[in-house]
Amino acid sequence: MPKRVLQGVVVSDKNDKTVVLKVERRYSHPLLQKTVRQSKKYKAHDENNQFKVGDFVSIQESAPISKDKRWVVLTSEAAG
């Protein structure tokens, strides 16, 4: 089974070798008939501490690295 890849914005880089990302998904609500935005935060492994707050990055699923980290930062995307 392929590993999931998500895109999000770095909201915290205060931890060593860890960044916190906010991943937003949009979907159409069946009853309200409007587009709803829902976000979730993920902790991802950043080996070289190279990503800063505000960066738009891609993360990939991995084996558990710690209690909360199960994602690895792949690349930085162009913001836009």
Curated annotation (Swiss-Prot):
Keywords: Ribonucleoprotein, Ribosomal protein, RNA-binding, rRNA-binding
Single biological process term from Gene Ontology: translation
Keyword Ribosomal protein annotated: yes
A GO molecular-function descriptor: rRNA binding
Superkingdom of origin: Bacteria
GO cellular component, one term: cytosolic small ribosomal subunit
Keyword RNA-binding appears in the UniProt entry: yes
Quaternary structure annotation from Swiss-Prot or TrEMBL: Part of the 30S ribosomal subunit.
Protein name: Small ribosomal subunit protein uS17
Species name: Brucella suis (strain ATCC 23445 / NCTC 10510)
